Amino acid sequence: MLAAFQQQQTRKFSPITNTSASCLNMQPNPPKISIAPSVISVIGVHMEKHKLKIKTGQNIVLSASILPIQATNKELIWSNMNSDIITIYPKGDTVTITGKSAGKAVVIVTTAEGKFRDLCVIHVQPYMTNPK
């Protein structure tokens, strides 16, 4: 049995002569494959607060989040429903709100494609000074 094993171990292998499957015959311009990034759809938007009280002249920053966090289009559109009461200064996922006069206003945030929105009611109270 040992002799049969030794005989198998001493066999010589001949080189491959069939070059049709070799690297030399590969296509010079292989087809290009591109993978498009997957689009992650927005499923909602959430504002951090839904009711706020501020004084006239006071500034406050409010933020909103696109859901899911990995969504492809993270653009938000901010709207002010009563520009006599507040002024808004949108910047990305935040908006700075300034109280102008006493009253109630609504700030709405909408996703860029318009499918989802959230809102915050802002109550602006007059700024009181101490009487003399």
From Swiss-Prot:
InterPro entries: Big_2, Invasin/intimin_cell_adhesion. Gene3D superfamilies: 2.60.40.1080. Residues 45-115 form the BIG2 domain. To B.anthracis BA1245. This is Uncharacterized protein BC_1230.
